[in-house]
Amino acid sequence: MSVLKEYRTVSEVVGPLMIVDQVAGVHYNELVDITLHNGARRKGQVLEVQGDKAMVQLFEGSTGINLAKTKVRFTGHPLELAVSEDMVGRIFDGMGQPIDGGPELIPEKYLDIDGQAINPVARDYPDEFIQTGISAIDHLNTLVRGQKLPVFSGSGLPHNELAAQIARQATVLNSDDNFAVVFAAMGITFEEAEFFMNDLRETGAIDRSVLFINLANDPAIERIATPRIALTTAEYLAYEKGMHVLVIMTDMTNYCEALREVSAARREVPGRRGYPGYLYTNLSTLYERAGRLIGKKGSVTQIPILTMPEDDITHPIPDLTGYITEGQIILSQELYKNGFRPPINVLPSLSRLKDKGSGEGKTRQDHAATMNQLFAAYAQGKQAKELAVVLGESALSETDKLYVAFTNRFEEEYINQGFYTNRSIEESLDLGWELLSILPRTELKRIKDDMLDRYLPKADTTMTKVFVAND
């Protein structure tokens, strides 16, 4: 066994970064043990090596470091996470240390938090439905096992409540396989952390969940490690324990801000909006860890959540995320102001794999047809409401008024289900048919006659109310 060298050659500390001179045999991503002059211990990771100089990123900050008296020891291995099946039901900090007062874990193995690149040939195609209990997702933007489907939110929108709802309700139908949720919260406040912990505990969802919490006052470097630690846990549970794992990561905007902070400390040339030029590559190292592997029973599905700065979908974070992932769920300020929860704007939302996880044998044979018809009817109803605002209700035809009635009920009953209503896919489909019955059968052009005969209820014209927007 080789003896690890100890260095006392720290030459500079800038923000979360430390420069160590006269090093030898040091490698990128190597874990570093740091001992301060008062005996306190901290950890870091090698970020860059040039000649005999190593740049180390500090996980616990640089406060109190004395250049002359600080001891640095390079461990010879990357940052690793101690993993165990007993992690399910536990709460950890952003570096994977238990914070729930429970017993210390007995590690089954240690895994590199950066994971291993997945050979594309080894990937299995995502094609199994995951039920979230939310109609706007399950019916209209179906989530498939092994998919990565982000949520694009805005400032002040209830994405935390939506994340907690998905964590509580998500399940794989028609399967006896174990299902687990790995929840990574990055840069959140104490209040938000309390909300997530209490919600999962009170509803019993903590029993199948692993929760990692990085607070806003924790170091930026820890924020960069948190999603990797969460994904390493998910991969272990999926590929070695055969579990279907849903990874929820919020807020990816805080993660990207931490990347920008470290990049600025390294004096790198900034890219768009000051973010590092490698932001796309860095995000891909997280998102591409979702998927299924041929010959492996488990799977990793991702729902990354991000807040769009200034509600700008062209901002680098949502823009680059959209290039890597397979769709997006977009939350609406307008729906939120009107009291609809969750405020999912279904028209610009998209799941690129929704057709792979729907249909007979997965959900129901009428899934795709009703989805397309609901989209078309809602879009036409929105246009009719806008026309009524400009020209008045009298300018609408009788059919247009029915579309307005459909649109209002669609938002009030279908989208506005609340954060504690868990709808099965059958309930979502049946509700969709009930709303479509408002419209004349001749308008339902995207559904075949045999399905209309089987599923379409007879419209009760006395119950149909027409609402025209006045704003």
From Swiss-Prot:
Stored SUPFAM superfamilies: C-terminal domain of alpha and beta subunits of F1 ATP synthase, P-loop containing nucleoside triphosphate hydrolases
Record organism: Streptococcus pyogenes serotype M18 (strain MGAS8232)
Membership in a protein family: Belongs to the ATPase alpha/beta chains family.
GO biological process: proton motive force-driven plasma membrane ATP synthesis
A molecular-function term among this protein's GO annotations: proton-transporting ATP synthase activity, rotational mechanism
Domain of life: Bacteria
Full protein name: V-type ATP synthase beta chain
UniProt KW keywords: ATP synthesis, Hydrogen ion transport, Ion transport, Transport
PANTHER family hit by this protein: V-TYPE PROTON ATPASE SUBUNIT B (PTHR43389:SF4)
Job of this protein: Produces ATP from ADP in the presence of a proton gradient across the membrane. The V-type beta chain is a regulatory subunit.
